[in-house]
Amino acid sequence: MSDVYAVDFALDLKASVPSSVLADLRWHLGIEAVGESGAQDPDGEMGDVVPLLAARGPAARIGGVMVGEFARKAGGWSLTARQEVHAELLPELDSLAERLAWNSSTEGVIGHIRFYEEDVPDLLINRSGTLVKTALAPAGTTTA
């Protein structure tokens, strides 16, 4: 058994996003050599942190393809990413998702995360710059 999660992001970032956040995001996407902390080893890793959105090609557990695209647009930036993330990296993923929500111009759903053996994801929602995780209930179940 593997502790892998499917993670998807689809959101826009404000034009005012700080350059340090852009650099960190580019590092996570594998398109910039140094992230926010500025220090890295020869493998492109920064201490115990690894790029979370840099994998490309067929996914090992979640099916489909892992992608990460980041593009300039009028009024800011657009990000789309789909990745497999190991459970031990979830704290770093939460930190990245919080920074994305804080700098996002997209209100509402900005992504979702799902344990690869589960059918139903948790939504990642931006509420005025605050990341809110909402668990969905599978069809036919009731919540209290």
What do the PLM-derived regions correspond to, one by one?
Residues 10, 35-38, 137-144:
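Short, surface-exposed, charge-dense and proline/glycine-enriched linear segments
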